[in-house]
């Protein structure tokens, strides 16, 4: 057996399916790469010891059925992993959590293997990657240039091919800027779509966990695992049942020439023009828009009372450990003292005005295409002018969470000096899957390698389009490989994903049914394991003809999924469960059938 040279999900899945390698071998190779700091120093704050990593490997099932089975990943060190210190790049502030963050729990449950905790700008405050006592990660293409921040180590770990994907966070652009500087994908989901429980906050009302990946396809696989409502996070939001999509011929907003700011970087300006042409080749029409209200909203993030949220997050540590913080971070957070409650409300009112002003833009376009940053800086430049140059890096990023947008950072080519440039696709909330689908077509049109890896983007699968029909959940004989699945496929139904119901459902094996069928019944107040199911998409006509054939005691109703969304689903009339065997404990119909040897 041998470990694949690249760790993109498509390659790993094929290697596992063929038996060419095992999760243990892949995890050991990821650990070996992580330990080699000669080319990419300062990536890690803590690498997990081999025994801890192998414990995650041993917990995997024998067969590779989980969506992220055996996929190595990294965790930004402001996100909790149970039993491992969370430092937020501030050693004196470190704590050891007893529970993992919700996003980490869900990734591990989906089969992913954590390798370690990555470096960041202290307290996730900065876009440069240079504000850490653990050193400054470098751009993978040139050691004199910054990696971007604050999720610096996570981006480098992916771009260098150490792990398949990595978690970051994003308040002002921390999940996008490092992607641009290292020629990879950075997806910042809709605010609240991924849980922030167990994520140490920068601005709690704005923060988003993010993912760095080699392709939009891989980022989409992580999205499917993490896009779920979390009752333990008061900022969690339920996604709409119908996922928004872009039309075949879409309109995308581009900056007016007079409003383009590249800070003297002519190469970046030229690459932005090329990106506009490239996205137009994917079926889009560029439309110039007024950037003023977006820029005004961006200015509020640091020149406004939202820095008070950063001060709240750090708490008494700010006052009791004056020498325990990076001096620039302390300066930024200390600015909170300038704002009072009146200023906070005034800023909220101004933001509402800016958001109102952007509506004219959203009536004219489906999405925006902006530079991720106007330029890139050498490390010595940032160190000599840390505040102003950091502000320059946020020129096109700081407004995104304030205005409740979803965003996808994708590569956009290289300057003549070999440094990468990136652009960001932005759309209103909950357009995440649509952005990834369009972004993967754009990325494929660009082609080339992802980061420093050998992964060829033009050979990567496209991220799936949002479903355009009626979503239907099936739990038994209509599952893939089961006797009645052809009733779906013959109607052109499209498989969307595997997931579970919310906890409040029971499953029964119905007697005297041919083929054998389960009955799913809602049980309010029941804290069950959730029942495994598949979600399919059917056209309205196909859905109507399908429902017409559903026999009693089966009915089509609505079911709540684990992510809080609601779809149409098979359910069972309660009378049919009288005397039936309850099989809820198996967690799903297939597990129950396997227990019978069927």
Where are these regions (language model features)?
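Short glycine/serine-rich loop segments
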Residues: 100-101, 105-226, 401-424
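Glycine-rich, small-residue loops and helix-cap segments
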Residues: 19, 70, 109, 163-164, ...
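Short helix-loop capping/hinge segments that flank enzyme active sites or metal/cofactor-binding pockets
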Residues: 68-90, 247-255, 305-359, 364, ...
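Acyltransferase
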Residues: 20-28, 58, 264-290, 315-320, ...
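Gly/Ser-rich, acidic/histidine-flanked active-site/gating loops
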Residues: 5, 70, 82, 208, ...
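A short helix-breaking turn/cap at a secondary-structure junction
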Residues: 188-270, 274, 293, 320, ...
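Compact nucleic-acid interaction/catalytic patches
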Residues: 469, 480-506
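Gly/Ser-rich catalytic/binding loops embedded in alpha/beta enzyme cores
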Residues: 2-171, 277, 282, 488-489
């Amino acid at each position: 057996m041998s470990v694949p040279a690249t760790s993109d999900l498509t390659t790993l899945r094929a290697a596992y399916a063929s038996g060419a390698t095992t999760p243990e071998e892949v995890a050991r190779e990821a650990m070996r790469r992580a330990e080699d700091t000669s080319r990419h120093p300062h990536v890690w704050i803590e690498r997990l010891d081999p025994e801890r990593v192998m414990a995650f490997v041993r917990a995997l099932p024998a067969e590779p059925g989980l969506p992220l089975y055996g996929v190595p990943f990294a965790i930004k060190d402001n996100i909790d992993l149970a039993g491992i210190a969370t430092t937020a790049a501030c050693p004196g502030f470190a704590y050891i959590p007893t529970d993992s963050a919700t996003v980490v729990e869900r990734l591990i449950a989906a089969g992913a293997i954590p390798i370690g905790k990555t470096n960041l700008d202290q307290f996730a405050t900065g876009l440069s990657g240079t504000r850490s006592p653990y050193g400054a990660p470098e751009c993978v293409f040139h050691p004199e240039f910054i990696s971007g921040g604050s999720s610096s180590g996570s981006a480098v770990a992916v771009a260098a091919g150490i792990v398949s994907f990595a978690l970051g966070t994003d308040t002002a652009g921390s999940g996008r800027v490092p992607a641009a500087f290292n020629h990879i994908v950075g997806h910042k989901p809709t605010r609240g779509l991924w849980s922030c429980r167990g994520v140490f906050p920068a601005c709690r009302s704005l923060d988003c966990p993010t993912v760095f990946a080699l392709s939009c396809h891989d980022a989409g696989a992580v999205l499917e695992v993490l896009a779920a409502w979390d009752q333990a996070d008061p900022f969690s939001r339920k996604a709409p049942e119908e996922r928004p999509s872009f039309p075949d011929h879409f309109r995308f907003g581009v900056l007016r020439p007079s409003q383009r700011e590249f800070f003297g970087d002519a190469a970046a300006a030229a690459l932005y023009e090329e990106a506009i042409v490239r996205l137009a080749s994917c079926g889009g029409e560029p439309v110039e828009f007024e950037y003023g209200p977006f820029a005004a909203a961006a200015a509020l993030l640091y020149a406004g009372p939202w820095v008070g949220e950063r001060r709240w997050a750090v708490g008494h540590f700010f006052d009791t450990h004056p020498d325990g913080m990076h001096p620039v971070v302390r300066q930024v957070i200390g600015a909170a003292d300038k704002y009072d409650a009146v200023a906070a409300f005034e800023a909220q009112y101004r933001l509402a005005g800016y958001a109102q002003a952007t509506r004219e833009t959203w009536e004219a376009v489906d999405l925006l295409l902006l530079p991720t940053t106007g330029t890139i800086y050498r490390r010595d430049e940032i160190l000599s002018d840390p505040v102003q140059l950091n502000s320059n890096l946020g020129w096109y990023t700081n407004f995104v969470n304030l205005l409740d947008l979803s965003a996808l950072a994708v590569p956009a080519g290289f300057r003549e000096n070999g440094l990468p440039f990136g652009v960001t696709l932005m759309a209103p909330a909950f357009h995440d899957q649509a952005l990834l689908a369009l972004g993967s077509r754009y990325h494929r049109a660009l082609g080339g390698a992802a980061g420093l890896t050998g992964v060829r983007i033009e050979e990567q699968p496209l991220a799936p389009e949002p479903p355009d029909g009626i979503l239907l959940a099936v739990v038994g004989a209509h599952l893939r490989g089961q006797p009645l699945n052809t009733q779906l496929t013959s109607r052109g139904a499209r498989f969307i994903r595997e997931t579970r119901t919310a906890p409040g459902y029971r499953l029964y094996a119905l007697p005297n049914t041919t083929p054998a069928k389960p009955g799913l019944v809602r049980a309010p107040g029941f804290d069950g394991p959730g029942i495994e199911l598949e979600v399919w998409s059917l056209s309205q006509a196909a859905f109507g003809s399908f429902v017409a054939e559903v026999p009693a005691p089966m009915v089509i109703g609505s079911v709540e999924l684990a992510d809080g969304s609601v779809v149409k689903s098979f359910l069972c009339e309660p009378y049919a469960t009288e005397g039936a065997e309850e099989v809820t404990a198996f967690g799903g119909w297939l597990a129950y059938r396997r227990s019978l040897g069927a």
